[in-house]
Amino acid sequence: MDKSQGVLLSSNVGAGSRPWPELLGSAHWDGLLDPLDLTLRRLILLCGDLCQVTYDSFNSDSHSRYCGSCRFSRATLLDRTQFPAAGDLSVAAYLYATSDATAFPGSMVYSMSREAWSKESNWIGYVAVSNDAAAAASGQRVIYVAWRGTIRSLEWVDVLKPDLVDHDDILPEGHPGRGRSRVMKGWYLIYSSTDERSPFSKYSARDQMLAAVRELVARYRNESLSVVCTGHSLGASLATLCAFDIVVNGVSKVGDGAHIPVTAVVFGSPQIGNPEFKKQFEEQPNLRALHVRNTPDLIPLYPSGLLGYANVGKTLQVDSKKSPYVKRDTSPGDYHNLQGILHTVAGWDGKDGEFKLQVKRSVALVNKSSGFLKDSNLVPESWWVERNKGMVLGQNGEWQLEGPAEENLPVPPVVTGKIIDDDVAAVATSSSAKEGKKTGKGSKLLSGLIDQLLCVPDTCKAGAA
């Protein structure tokens, strides 16, 4: 039985497919987007489902003590979310973020409990890598960085202030973008902020990510390596920023050799920065971005060029209105829904072509967290839910929220070692964009080796959280 849902498996890479560098945009996807190349289509769906894992595993119930955390351990994340390529990847690290609630309303959720696991941090994504079997089958060792988007409604668009700020803190000394390249404050604070009050945010999401990617690049330096950053909505902005960061700070450089390719594959992305950021991004020879955009979705138009923003990378434009499976009259949020976009990718045959599923992918996935499908498909709305919303009947006869099993409890990231090498990029020391105990400085120079941040199931004891 085909359970791949159309995503790229290690067994699909090789004979009959375009070379891996081309799929990652080495030639800017010339000749691959219209018509949409089959292997690239599968890679896009793989990235989309990596993003979906962040939604399916995120605890957003404010009644739970563990609201804002991931429901599953690294060892079980992909299996528990029924990720179709779970047999090909191992989750190496979890990423946690903190941010001032006023910087990006709706980006963080917190428990109402006085005994909450954290009052300052949220799980924001993960780093995964091809396991040994998949790398051997495909000839590629791929590091994936998946960022979670906001789980709130699109009301955040009305209240989010699109202020542009410099990101000199994450640019090396002497970089031509310093003082000129600017990104949206909301994205940047989530990416680069720390909070000493939280053991999960003593290091920024950025620091956690860079440490994880650097260690994996060092571990697999003798193999054919690449990095793919992916995200949807807010996560798309973080993925684009993170891909840029990896390249300009030399994390993609293998020893004294060349830089490995780094690609952002993003969905429904708001605009990230000003024209100078776009220029600096697109001038990097080993850096690419592919933005999958649904035509009726308005979020990619935000904040707009009128406010000083510019689009980054190549765009694959699809249109969900061509699908015969979805409603014609629907809410704006449905056009932005990730599974709606992935469904459209699965059946896309160009602007003038007929919509027809080109890979086997369940139509029911569209309604995973929406009501976008026509009622005639007989699929209930928003069907991906915890059984009884996590309520269980206790031995005392009382119904109560069930806490996570011990192996699924949140574990603070431990980062030791240099996040940025001194001889590759110097860490800027400009003032923080935030006040108080939270800081927006993107990097910390630490001594020693990276330790305990990563636990890849291929090499670590089974069952590690």
Swiss-Prot record:
Sorted UniProt keywords: Cytoplasm, Hydrolase, Lipid degradation, Lipid metabolism
Record's protein name: Phospholipase A1-II 5
EC number: 3.1.1.-
PANTHER family linked: PHOSPHOLIPASE A1-IIDELTA, PHOSPHOLIPASE A1-IIGAMMA
Catalytic residues (UniProt): 233, 297, 336
GO biological process per UniProt: cellular response to UV-B; lipid catabolic process; UV protection
Signal peptide positions (record): none
Organism, as annotated: Oryza sativa subsp. indica
SUPFAM superfamilies registered for this protein in UniProt: alpha/beta-Hydrolases
Role played: Acylhydrolase that catalyzes the hydrolysis of phospholipids at the sn-1 position.
Family per record: Belongs to the AB hydrolase superfamily. Lipase family.
Stored InterPro entries: AB_hydrolase_fold (IPR029058), Fungal_lipase-type (IPR002921), PLA (IPR033556)
GO CC annotation: cytoplasm
GO molecular function terms attached to this record: phospholipase A1 activity
Localization annotation: Cytoplasm
